[in-house]
Amino acid sequence: MAKRKTLPKDFEQLVQTASDEDIKKVLGKCDINAYGGYNKGNALEFPLSEEMMRWLIEQGIDINYVDQYGYTPLLYHAGRMLSEKQAIALVKLGADITATQGLDRETVMHVAVKTGNLELVKCLIQAGADAEVTSRSGETPLERAFHWARTFDLIKLAPVAEYLIGIGVPVTDKIRTYMRSAAEDIEFRRKDMSPDIMPELDRAMESLYGLLGVASVPRRVEYDGTSPIVIHEKRWQKQHGELWNLLVPGSGHAGTVQGEVIRISGKLAYEILDNACCNWDSDFKSMANALYRYICMGTPLDAYEQREFAGLINGIKDADETDINRLTEL
């Protein structure tokens, strides 16, 4: 009788509740490389015990089977905090530690560092993995991790960075720049973050500041709603950034009309210039109309500039960088 090419639909639930012997009985009815799950990987991509993995390898399963998204079992588990023990088991059982995935050809080491799997990183080093291997874009695992690090990622990244730097991985200017960017984003949104996680996040940030030689990002000073709004910068681009930091909250609407003018102009610029209007909908058009109403309030632009601004708003979706810069300047 021919064996099935796919794993049972409930295989993931099965491996979490059934014994290894029961799992073997189920797998005995399947081809050794039968695939399943969202990624259509073979059985090694599921949360099996090390003993079960060893048995499958002895039966001839492909330890480096590539699923429909380009992941080997090791790459798949390396990218999940809860799968670290499976990833370590696969390294010990001989999985290819040089396998890559994605358009940027990230290695297992890249994935493990980015995920914050410290014990897996140590295991990979012991197995001979290169801690300074570069992706297609030329980034080392530590550079790649800081490139994508946001808010709480720094908590899990701090001990990994300490370990890698401790064994000689260099701290590059890229890493410092990425760390600075992540820290600035955290300080901008600090008020909106859960206070329960902040002590741990602050400890991680202080550790990384010292470890990487990055100056601490100062706490954000927000507008109190009543004081005069004072601008210190001279160029309009710098003025917009200064007002953004002062008036725009980490999330939601600003508390003042001035803040809404800065917030909306910034959101429109990002959607048009950075996203090429891929998310454009009636909400963005409404924001553009609201921006024009706000501009006409208080101390409005002179008549000529109001007409110019109205023209820019009417053609906002088709605006180019020059148009957006002029709108933001006004």
What function would you assign to each model-found segment?
Residues 84-90, 96-102, 106-110, 114-116:
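Eukaryotic tandem repeat interaction scaffolds
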Residues 4-12, 34-46, 66-79, 100-108, ...:
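Ankyrin-repeat boundary/"N-cap" motif
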Residues 18, 48-51, 81-82, 116, ...:
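Ankyrin-repeat intra-repeat helix-capping/turn positions
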Residues 102-107, 133-330:
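Ankyrin repeat (ANK) tandem arrays and their immediately adjacent linkers/low-complexity segments
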Residues 2-46, 51-56, 61:
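N-terminal segments that cap or nucleate solenoid repeat domains
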Residues 105-139:
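Internal alpha-helical scaffold/solenoid segments in large eukaryotic proteins
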Residues 24-31, 54-63, 88-97, 122-130, ...:
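Ankyrin repeat domain, specifically the short helix-to-loop turn at the C-terminus of the second helix
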